[in-house]
């Protein structure tokens, strides 16, 4: 029986993880559920899954949750950073699902890595903000890192076993690999006229054609910043050289990514667009378990199409790829600026196309600095957020 801590339990990844646990009760137990402020959803999850611990990032939310839970469940409710870090590093914990969206997930995820846990990584920002430090800590502690993002999980499945065992420090060329092909649907605005993008609303941006996701990642998919962040994440997970990683638009989201080998072979991982598949794979690796996902019906798929990304339509993707090549400072700044800009767009304070403008200006204005510690990373993150908010106030 594996004990899991689920960071981001009330989000889409968290709920899908709990569904997989429920389908495999003889193998997994939700040891602790972690959320930010969603008291009602957390209460319902606690009643259904009976974790030993429920942690709310917000202290007042923790108090409301404690009052809302029926007596007799025996669930300990906590809040605060110290309690959270204690949960992810607890001796009873085998696996940590890192699914808190954004920079907020970095500290507990890094703590789980340092404690040598099996970490299922759905929080791409951890690598975008601190890729070099994160991978060094993974190697030092011996933690097992398994990607949950559908694309990175697909790539992982298409790699030789030896490369899988050396994630973060692998040599793709030595394994006969020429390219990793990172696929993306292009989001809801793939074919929208360019002159209409400035007036797109949050509701329109959140209507992804294939995936069911939260608001932040839905907007990132509409700008293709999500693919840009995944590009950066893939660089760290698979130790890619500059010319070993490419982005391919694939509107149907049936092929989740591909690996191209030197002999001309291309291995692709395919399946219906349901996050329970990569979650179940990461949870059970190297075995396989039921995920509750319908098998792919090739007769219904009909056809698959591919095209190159249009950077005039998706400037955020180009910003992210360029930042990846510039280094850790640029990706840390970009991630922070984008989180602030997307929040402002969802609040109706800026337009859709302003997101890329804010991101680009932040990248151009913050002075370069050497990020040699977590404190330095967090300081740069704070400075980028301050600048982004300043720029937004002038829009």
UniProtKB/Swiss-Prot annotation:
Residues engaged in binding NADPH: 10-13, 36, 123, 125, 214
Pathway: Isoprenoid biosynthesis; isopentenyl diphosphate biosynthesis via DXP pathway; isopentenyl diphosphate from 1-deoxy-D-xylulose 5-phosphate: step 1/6
Reactions mediated catalytically: 2-C-methyl-D-erythritol 4-phosphate + NADP(+) = 1-deoxy-D-xylulose 5-phosphate + NADPH + H(+)
Cofactors named for this entry: Mg(2+); Mn(2+)
Sequence intervals crossing the membrane: none
Pfam families the UniProt entry points to: DXP_redisom_C, DXP_reductoisom, DXPR_C
GO MF annotation list: 1-deoxy-D-xylulose-5-phosphate reductoisomerase activity; manganese ion binding; NADPH binding
EC identifiers of the protein: 1.1.1.267
Biological process annotations from GO: isopentenyl diphosphate biosynthetic process, methylerythritol 4-phosphate pathway involved in terpenoid biosynthetic process
Class in the EC hierarchy, top level: oxidoreductase
Residues the record lists as binding 1-deoxy-D-xylulose 5-phosphate: 124, 150-151, 185, 208, 221, 226-227, 230
Keywords for this protein: Isoprene biosynthesis, Manganese, Metal-binding, NADP, Oxidoreductase
Positions annotated to bind Mn(2+): 149, 151, 230
Chain's role: Catalyzes the NADPH-dependent rearrangement and reduction of 1-deoxy-D-xylulose-5-phosphate (DXP) to 2-C-methyl-D-erythritol 4-phosphate (MEP).
Family: Belongs to the DXR family.
Protein name in UniProt: 1-deoxy-D-xylulose 5-phosphate reductoisomerase
Organism from which the protein derives: Shewanella amazonensis (strain ATCC BAA-1098 / SB2B)
